[in-house]
Amino acid sequence: MTTSGKENFRLKSYKNKSLNPDEMRRRREEEGLQLRKQKREEQLFKRRNVATAEEEAEEEVMSDGGFHEAQMNNMEMTSSAVITSDMIEMIFSNSPEQQLSATQKFRKLLSKEPNPPIDEVISTPGVVARFVEFLKRKENCTLQFEAAWVLTNIASGNSLQTRIVIQAGAVPIFIELLSSEFEDVQEQAVWALGNIAGDSTMCRDYVLDCNILPPLLQLLSKQNRITMTRNAVWALSNLCRGKNPPPDFAKVSPCLSVLSWLLFVNDTDVLADACWALSYLSDGPNDKIQAVIDAGVCRRLVELLMHNDYKVVSPALRAVGNIVTGDDIQTQVILNCSALQSLLHLLSSPKESIKKEACWTISNITAGNRAQIQTVIDAHIFPALINILQTAEFRTRKEAAWAITNATSGGSAEQIKYLVELGCIKPLCDLLTVMDSKIVQVALSGLENILRLGEQESKRSGAGINPYCALIEEAYGLDKIEFLQSHENQEIYQKAFDLIEHYFGTEDEDSSIAPQVDLSQQQYIFQQCEAPMEGFQL
């Protein structure tokens, strides 16, 4: 994750060997993966083109009371009556007028909210293939457009429904239509391709293998109407999305130069999807991060952290956070863009997910070198982190704990003392009773780093007393560490025992505290302790 020289330096300089550099600088794991699987409010992977208000009014204002009657008819209509024999007959006729009329009827059916009859349409023999055939009618752009709209809405359905469109051979034709002379046809084609690519990594890779990127980037490079640009950059973000497996970077990286100027388009939707695309491209090993940095997007991404719409802030923050999972040099690029002031601002966001993501980003900066930890100190970020550690939701507190423990692991004596003076000990002690084993370990590591410094200071001064032991006891930390000796996690109970033995032991220590050893099982046997009064906290 870092260059070999850097890694050797880090391994020597980190006082806490239980959190190695790879662990400290964390890629998005566990919770992040779950977040990615969810359909975020800010981002839709599939979209249906619905009928306009004018068209619906046109259809529904019939005779006296026609609007109410149409509503009742829609509610009562059975699936068997949705597609009439006339529609099927017309679509297979040789008359262009009848073909267009029938295609429009299908399109209106599939544009209805909330449950379009996609299954009825795809189960009608030959209909999907007929619409794909209509895509080829260059002499009739209206028919092309209507057929593309129908197929877009079929592809907005579930994976099986999307696969029907792929199997009918629509994708290569849609890619050809990106170069159509007619903007409406181009836009509908890009919408369809975005839906198909957004279905799954398999569909995404198939669309990429059909060589969508050159014509899509060509389309984006033109001065288009804004709806076209929105659809195209949304489709592009779907082509970059996905982790298992990620897209072939060689196939998607050519879009970086286009994304770099899309970040300056004055449209919230375009900015949001461009940032999502960059967040996907930067989510990976350092060579991918470097390609994103080389595209020159970092300064603009940092600027967008202060955008007034969370729809933009969220993916911009995700991209910035991914970049600082790289090595120290890559992290420094973000720091050189004055990111810390923006991150400090985001730590007070009313949106919890933004606070959490900002803490995660900072935790990867504090996993850097001492100069980088100092820039975080100079930006007055740690007081806000300690406040979060005491008051925020648990998922956010976890990230703040990583940020503080990372700083105690790689920081200098002065930097660690600064954190102690800010009051980091009590909130770290409070984390010792949570149910999340990993965070208990993180808190223990932070406290161990502080205790180790206290021991060094006491030896240097000749006082013989570790000043931080008393602070931990005052925060009820010792009681909690003692309780952890009966923890089910072996690393936790071993660490708890070691801390007590090394830093809190006395010559007349009660021998009953020390665990017995089960030689047959190669493990310690701990006596059951009563839980502290406050119990486990989440």
Swiss-Prot record:
Keyword Disulfide bond tagged: no
Highest taxon above the source species: Eukaryota
IBB domain location: 1-57
Region (NLS binding site (major)): 149-241
Annotated GO MF terms: nuclear import signal receptor activity; nuclear localization sequence binding
ARM repeats: from-to residues: 77-117, 118-161, 162-206, 207-245, 246-290, 291-330, 331-372, 373-412, 413-457, 460-504
Motif Nuclear localization signal positions after renumbering to this chain: 42-51
Region of interest (NLS binding site (minor)), ranges: 318-406
GO-annotated biological processes: NLS-bearing protein import into nucleus; postsynapse to nucleus signaling pathway
Pfam families xref list: Arm, Arm_3, IBB
Entry keyword set: Cytoplasm, Nucleus, Protein transport, Repeat, Transport
Localization per record: Cytoplasm; Nucleus
Region (Binding to RAG1): 245-437
GO cellular component, as recorded: cytoplasm; dendrite; nucleoplasm; nucleus; synapse
Biased composition (Basic and acidic residues): 20-38
Family assignment from sequence similarity: Belongs to the importin alpha family.
Cited function: Essential for selective protein import into nucleus. Promotes signal-dependent binding of karyophilic proteins to the nuclear envelope.
Subunit structure: Forms a complex with importin subunit beta-1.
Name the UniProt record assigns to this protein: Importin subunit alpha-5
